[in-house]
UniProtKB/Swiss-Prot annotation:
GO biological process: tyrosine metabolic process
Homology family: Belongs to the beta-eliminating lyase family.
Keywords on record: Lyase, Pyridoxal phosphate
Protein name, per record: Tyrosine phenol-lyase
Residues where N6-(pyridoxal phosphate)lysine is found: K258
Assembly behavior: Homotetramer.
One function term, GO molecular function aspect: tyrosine phenol-lyase activity
Protein's organism: Symbiobacterium sp. (strain SC-1)
Entries under InterPro entries matching the protein: ArAA_b-elim_lyase/Thr_aldolase, Beta-eliminating_lyase, PyrdxlP-dep_Trfase, PyrdxlP-dep_Trfase_major, PyrdxlP-dep_Trfase_small, Tryptophanase_CS, Tyr_phenol_ly
Gene3D superfamilies: Aspartate Aminotransferase, domain 1, Type I PLP-dependent aspartate aminotransferase-like (Major domain)
PROSITE patterns attached to this UniProt entry: BETA_ELIM_LYASE
Lineage of source species: Bacteria, Bacillati, Bacillota, Clostridia, Eubacteriales
Class in the EC hierarchy, top level: lyase
Catalytic activity: L-tyrosine + H2O = phenol + pyruvate + NH4(+)
Amino acid sequence: MQRPWAEPYKIKAVEPIRMTTREYREQAIREAGYNTFLLRSEDVYIDLLTDSGTNAMSDRQWGALMMGDEAYAGARSFFRLEEAVREIYGFKYVVPTHQGRGAEHLISRILIKPGDYIPGNMYFTTTRTHQELQGGTFVDVIIDEAHDPQANHPFKGNVDIAKFEALIDRVGADKIPYINVALTVNMAGGQPVSMANLREVRKVCDRHGIRMWSDATRAVENAYFIKEREEGYQDKPVREILKEMMSYFDGCTMSGKKDCLVNIGGFLAMNEEWILQKAREQVVIFEGMPTYGGLAGRDMEAIAQGIYEMVDDDYIAHRIHQVRYLGEQLLEAGIPIVQPIGGHAVFLDARAFLPHIPQDQFPAQALAAALYVDSGVRAMERGIVSAGRNPQTGEHNYPKLELVRLTIPRRVYTDRHMDVVAYSVKHLWKERDTIRGLRMVYEPPTLRFFTARFEPIS
């Protein structure tokens, strides 16, 4: 018999949550325009909207807050953050930002010119928006398996080398400032990239003089999957695997609100001094001094401490297995989800869950709203609403994946919470024919999934 195992932490403080009535939730989602982003948090029972900034900090991180140096310039907290990034990630230079999209903004302004092409292993909403705002065009070069929810490829986040080289041949290397490799790939279901693939991408970049950049937001989760699935890494600590992964990149954007186990903050890291200088010039305009980048000293201290905690092997094993615990319950019930189960979330396949709802009636949005009404569980749409519109034609982008993301915050919920979520999803699966599509009644010009409003189609 296998010995059971438990969370590698004790709980020191708790926050009460409350279950509401179905009638209350029906009114709440109606007032929110059937957009789970617009719900009030006190009306949510279990919040699986995102793992961004929703983590529980450790006692050492809370203690680190008291060590924050709030000097306007040259704060020692910045140098502690810089030291942590250099030691764990291996990059020479660091510029703090208020969160990940601050770093995306900086690197997009520095490297992208109008008419450039930025290949990547599937789009991410804010990343692509920053690229387009600078006149660039995102090009998806992920392997085909990533677009099939049922394809059980161990590294569905891999770059398709043939697609990457075909783009270079078509537009020329001088039109490609960098390739952006996400670790893991959020929009594909939290899927990892193999170390072998990173090496191959690096070879192509070196051959053509193209920079290799990483969205390292969930790189620790990626490192754990390499440890599990890639030959030669089973006996290596996650900390060592992460360092090797980052060694193939020229720099990274980072949202500390995920891997780093904090509620706010991010950074831009790089090896080229001229990019550092440009980033410092830009960060003063948009974020703050180069030694705080829109963050309080105490937040930089918490990020630095979190960087050391995130590479603890026991912690990251628990993190991945809690997500897997939820996903395996759904698979056993025959519910369609993205496979293999990802690192930060379980993704429901809304196309297969609600085949009677056409994509232009927003099935993932409808399913997320129905889940909230059923149980008070808040999830996130990751389908046509998130994909937005083509900036040239104004038409909807129709992604192959139409997903609902059940995102697990780090060190926040227990497996009993996962049981509640699984029960609700299984109940909806039985009642799926009763769920109706939606029409969009308000649409903002960019990043519409945050604030768009909907109503049911009768």
